[in-house]
Structure formats: structure tokens, C-alpha cells
Amino acid sequence: MLIVMNRGCRLVSRIPLGFRRLKRNPNPGLRNILCRRYSPLALSKEVTEALKNNVPVVALESTIITHGMPYPQNEELAIQVESKVRSMGAVPATIALLNGQCTIGLEQFQLSELAKSGETAYKVSRRDLSYVASQRLNGGTTVAATMILARAAGIDVFATGGIGGVHRGAENSMDISADLIELGRTRVAVVSAGVKSILDIGRTLEVLETQGVPVVTLGPPKSAFPAFFSRESKFQSPLSLETPQLIANMLFSNIQLGQECGTLVAIPTPHHCSIDYEKMEALIETCLQRSVQLGITGKNVTPWLLGELLRESKGKSLNTNIDLVLNNAEKASLIAKELAVLKEKSSFFPTNTGNTFETKPVKQDFFYGKVSDKGVSSSKKKITETTSKPAEVVCVGSVSIDSVLKLDNPLTSKFLGTSHPCHSEQAFGGVAHNMALASSLMGASTKLVSCVGTKSVPTSSIKEYLTKSSLQHTIVEKSNFTSCSYTAINDCNGNLLLAGADMAIMENLSYSEIKDDLNDAKYICFDGNISPSLMLDITTSKSSKQRVVFEPTSGPKTLKILKVLSVASIDFITPNKFELDVLFQAMKDGNFFENESWWQKLNSFGITSSFYNEIERFTKSTGIEEITENGILQKCFHLLPFIKNIIVKLGPNGALLISSEKLQGVNSNSASLFTPGNVTVKYYPVPKVIATPVNASGTGDTFIGTFTALLSKGWGMDDAIDTAQKAAGLTLQCNFSVNPEIKTLLK
């Protein structure tokens, strides 16, 4: 018997279709023959998902790999830089041209092959992009080319070592880097250790001023502009700001103003690796004179000079170069994270503002047309609402038409890829709808808050159904969207094999459209289909007496709650084992468990070594070894400082409660544990009410709706969870998303 089976989902990318990542053959020397048409831009899956969900992304250039240093040091540094970005909670996007395809986010084998290619790869600036792409060549991108491709993908922050600039003697040679011109017309923040010190820093700053490029140094007022190898040059920085957050505010203002210029963010070289400015100047002058004598010009000057400095400094310049690149990546990640928060909270900022290859100014009405978090909603939106007594439970999320196909016979692998006899059923569903319906059937005053599209057939059916039902609801109509739909394929026992969900419309529901519906609620439940910004607004805007319940819905959608957990805590989460694993790993990778406040909170729970001895007794008494074998308890303890109550749905094995609150109605028995710090752990086995399983879809939703309704009516925790499991079991035995008979459990 399987009580809990959350529905799968199809993630709908906001990246323009032509820019989605194409399948690549693991051999980078072969053309991609799997694609029907050639796309100039390929985003990795990791970068695509990050951009779609407003996870901070940091672009990284690749000339440092192809032309910056020899193999294998170049590959080692590239891996270190990406690891640094990830450790700071951002997603790295190394950019390069592979077989002519502009690739945003390299796989490990691609990074390795590029590092091995070295200077046989092209050094690609703006002028080289079309040639290298058309000839299907490999290339490392300079600052200019990386900016262009980052902007096309919608990446706002780019970390590098140092930018190009005005070469010494440029009054005669006219040797001025394209990086400076690009900064004047491509809106990407370039985080670097200033300008490469082999260049003319003073004239470079003058050109940047002419191009209208803001130049800001991370540091106190009137900071010196850094000189790459040296922490300070003899030139004062045009602007100075003391924290990454202040710099992010500046970048966000640049976006709001609709400017298309980039920003140069200068990061002073760390003290421990900085080289004395005067000593480095003398060494550079010697090397420059030698380059003139040898006739080295153009784009060959910089790599030659860096090689000479490495030799003359006996390796110190390389060590400094590596340290400053890692330092820049760290600071860029912090800035990107702060900028992502600002974008998430903004009332008009879209999730992805990439422009394709054209870097034309983005019209302001494009921004304002986006449904926002707390901003003013469009007056063109039609809102249909039922009115009744104030709702104690409000469920925010999807309402859909669910199609369930149950196979007549067992499925074997040799019969995949063909049709099978089955029985089909259609019903109205959606996670929030099912939770609301279950809550209403259990006697709680409940309201569903959702939206429907105007361009799909199911819309009229959904509206008609809700109008005739007794379920209170607020439905927002959105033009040019399709309503939610869900299709599940179950095996002959009713267990889910595969499902597809089209819930894209829910990403466009805004807080301003529904905030009045939340005022009277004791419990606000939302599913994983709504946007991270709406989750954040609901959580941060609720009153102190209101409780928030998050139903993850699926593994990928579980990660939407990270934006909330970075700034606030939530009251309840109801993951299954897979969703718990996904959330734990993401928080671990995002360094949620590294700050001092987390340690202090965890220590206050009193989870000592003696308590772990109690866990062994607890495991034996419950007979559920997976609680410890799969690390479920340990993962929940890690999450507890962020989430007050965690109910892990164990499918046929029942449910597990972990709470940091003093709960009502939790009786002590052999299946319960209590720490000195008021942490409660209790296992709830499955009630013996299940006959023949028919349909697992909706069982988890029924559990949560019933559980929340009973809490709102003052039930204790034990009774609420036991009854919710019985309700889920009744739904398992029918073809409805919620079995109407669950109301008999109140008798």
C-alpha cells in the first residue's frame, strides 16, 4: 500500500526556445548530429534551471583556460573557481565556444578538453564570435565575448581576473581593448581585480568614463583603484562601496533605469598575495621594453607579458593571479546572491532578462507587464471570487483537470514504447485544490486561491465546476495562458509510474492579486507550483498568528522554498523521502548549514550523543530502519532551524514528525523521542483501513488538507496525523483526487 505519491512535473523553461541546451556528443570533436537544427547558444541544464528560478548565476570567462596558463594548472584553476562559486551558493557558468556553439555552463569533460586544447583554441572577442561560430571552431572567450554571451543568456554578474584596457603607448599604437567598448554597451557587471597592471590604468579609467561605465571598488570611501597584482594603484577609484549588498543595489538601479552599459566592479587583491605596486611597475616596464624589441603586438602582448612576469617574479605572479581570481569569484557570488534577492522582491523584474544576441535596450513596458510579488497587479486581470464566511484555511496553488490512466496488466520493460490497455478517469484536481477540498470536507472553513488561463478548453470546465461546488474560491483569469492540467499513468495496482504536469500559469500568480484572501486565515497552505517570489511574499507578510504549510509537490519544485529559507522560517513542510533528500542536498551545497546562527540554534535543541543512543532504541521499537539508514532523522535535524515542523511521508510505512515546537496532543510512547531542547520525534504507523489500492494520485494532498483542517479546529497533533493518514487511505481506494467519504472520519 502506498499512501503518499506526489505528482511529477514538467519544468517549463523561460529561456527562448532557440537558446535551450542541445544534446552534445561526449566527444567534443564530433558535430551534434542529434539536432535537427543548429542553435548558436547552448545552456547547461544547471544554468537553465538556475536562471528560470532566479538562483544566482556567475559567468566565468575561458581565455584564462585557453591562454592564461598551461595545462594542467588551467584545468585545476577552472575547477577551483567553479567550486568557489558553488560554495558561496551560486551557480557557475563557464562560457566558451565548442565546435562553434556558444556554450553557457561547461560539463566536466568539456572543461577538460578545452583546457587541453590550450592556445590551439581561438582567443574570441566580439569581432571573432561570428567567424568561430560559423566555422564550428573551439574558442576561449575574452571579457568582451563573455559579456555578450552572458547578456544573451540573462546572466547579470561575471567574474574574471582583470579586464583589458588601454595599452601603454596606445597614443601611438591605438591598442585599446574591446573590453572597454563592450562595458559601455552590454549590461553585465564585471567583477575583477581592476585592470591588468601591464596596461595604462589612468588612460583606461579615462576611456571607461567616456564610455559611461560606472567603476566602483569594493572598499571604504576614496579607495584606491586596484592594480591586479597589487592591492592599490596610484589612482583613486571613481566610486567606492563597502559591501556586496550596496554594490548589488547599484547594479539593480542600473537595471531599473533601463541603462544598457555594464559596470566594472573592482576587488582589491587579498593582502596575503598582493605584490608591491612600485616593484611590479618596474618589472612590467622591463618586460614591455623587451616586447617592443621583439615586435610583439596586438592580442599577443598580454599572454606574452604574463609569461615573462611569471618567469621574472619566480612564480609569484602566477600565485597572485590564482588567488585573486578565486577572491573575485567569491565576491561576485555574494553580489549575485544579493542581486537575486532584489530581483525576487522587485515589483517589475522578470525572471530572465536575456536578450538573445541583440543587445538592444529593453523597453520598460516589458518589465511592468510582468506580474509581480507585492507590486500593483494589472487592472486588466479579471478576478472571480465567491464570498462566504472568513476562511480559516487558505490553499494557494493549482487547480487542474486530472487524467488518470490505470494499466490493466503489469508492465514489463520489453513492452515499453507502445500502447497498453487501460482504464481512464478524469477529475478535477491540482494540489492546492485537493488540499482545499479535503480541508473543506473535514469541516474547516476553507478557500482555494488559484488561477486559470483563457486560451485552453479546460478553463470553462474548471470555472463551471467551481461555480457549482460549495468550495470557496478566488480564481484569477490570465490571458494568453493555458489552465493547469495533469496526466498520470498508474500501474495495475494504482501506483504511479509516470506523470506529466503543465502548471506554468501558476508562476504568474502575484501576491497583490491574492493578499486580501489571506487576511483571516489561521493556516496558509501553498504548493510547489507557485513562484518563489509569491512564496516569499506570503511567508514574510503573514501575521505572527498565522501558520504557513508548504507542500513540495515534486523534487525539483521543492527547491523553490530556498528563497524563503534564506530570509525566514516556515511552520510546516510535508516532503516525501525524495523531496527531503533534494532539499537537504541543496541547502548543504548552498552553505545554509555553515553560519554561526545555525550552529547556535542546532545546539539549543539538545541533540547530544546520548540522544543518538535513544534513536537506536526508537528505530528498533518502530521497526523502520530506513529512518536511520537513509539519514532521514539527521537530515531533518539539519533543517529544523529553518523549518519548525517537518512531517516526512514514508509511503506504506506511515509518517514521521520532527518538531522544534511545544506541541499539543503528542503522547509519549515507544515510538516517540524528546530532547532537552524540546525537539519532538514521533513515528506514526499506517492505520489498518486500506483494502485494495486503486489510485495513489491525490493521497498526499488529502493527507495535508485533512491534517491542516484538524489543526485549525484545535485537534492535537497525534489525532490530526492519524486521521489524516486514514483520509489518505480512503482516497487511495477510489478514483477521485479526494475521496468524499473522508468526512465520515469526523463521526
Swiss-Prot record:
It comes from Schizosaccharomyces pombe (strain 972 / ATCC 24843) (Fission yeast). Pfam families: Indigoidine_A (PF04227), PfkB (PF00294). Gene3D superfamilies: 3.40.1190.20, Indigoidine synthase domain (3.40.1790.10). This is Pseudouridine-metabolizing bifunctional protein C1861.05. Substrate binds at K123, V143, S177, A178, D179. The keyword Plastid does not apply. Keywords: ATP-binding, Cytoplasm, Glycosidase, Hydrolase, Kinase, Lyase, Manganese, Metal-binding, Nucleotide-binding, Transferase. In the N-terminal section; belongs to the pseudouridine-5'-phosphate glycosidase family. In the C-terminal section; belongs to the carbohydrate kinase PfkB family. Its EC number is 4.2.1.70, 2.7.1.83. Mn(2+) binds at D175.
